[in-house]
Amino acid sequence: ENCYGKKNFFMYKYNGIQPGILTNHADRIEYAEGDYKLLDGVYLIPHKTVGLEKIAKKVNLYVKDNGKMFPDDFAHEQSLVFDTPKGLVIFNSCSHGGPDNIITEVLATFPEKEICAYVGGLHLYKSSEKEVRELADRIKETGITKIITGHCTGDEAFVILKEELGDVIEQMYTGMEIEL
C-alpha cells in the first residue's frame, strides 16, 4: 500500500500496512476488482462514487504516485457485504469514502435488496455537528435498523448519532456478539 496521513503542510506519515507484506505473501493474496462474489451470499463491493478525493483531502489521507502526493480516491477500499434473510449486512473498516456513499453503492449493486445492518467505523472524528446530523438524516431514509460503529466514528459524533438514531446505533467493543 502507499497510504499516508498529512501531518502538516510539508510532512506526511506512512499509515499503510507493513511494507513488504504484499510482496512477501503474494502467493496467498488474490486481488479482487469490481463487484466480487466470494461465495454464495458474500460479496466484496468496491467504491464506485466519483470524487472521493474531496473527502480524503478534508481528513488528510493521501497516496504517493511517482513521488508525488495526491488525495486518496479510496479505489483500493472495499466493503464486505452479506446477503442474509433479513437483508444486506455491510462490514467496513473505517468507511473512509463516507458511510452514505458506501450505502448508496451497495444499494445500487443490489437494487432489489434492503440493508438491515452496517458494521464498521464511520470516520467522522473530523466532521462538524451539522455534517453528522445530516448524515443521520440520510441514514434514517435508508431504513437500516442496526448500526454498530468502530473507534474512528469519534466520541462526539457518536453522541450526536445516538441522539438522532437512538437504539439503531451502538458502539462496537471487544468480544461483542452481533445478533440480527
Predicted regions, residues:
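Cap/insert and terminal regions of metallo-dependent hydrolase folds
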Residues: 73-79, 83-90, 94-174
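Short, charged, surface-exposed secondary-structure boundary motifs
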Residues: 4-8, 126-129, 178-180
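Active-site HxH/HxHxD metal-binding segment of metal-dependent hydrolases
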Residues: 1-35, 48-56, 140-148
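Short loop/helix-cap segments at secondary-structure boundaries that form the rim of catalytic
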Residues: 22-23, 37-41, 160-163
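Short, solvent-exposed secondary-structure boundary motifs
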Residues: 20-26, 68-73, 160
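General small-molecule cofactor/ligand-binding pocket signal
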Residues: 28-32, 43-45, 168-170
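Active-site-proximal loop/helix segment associated with metal-binding centers of metalloenzymes
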Residues: 9-16, 34-86
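Glycine-centered loop/turn motifs
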Residues: 35, 173-177
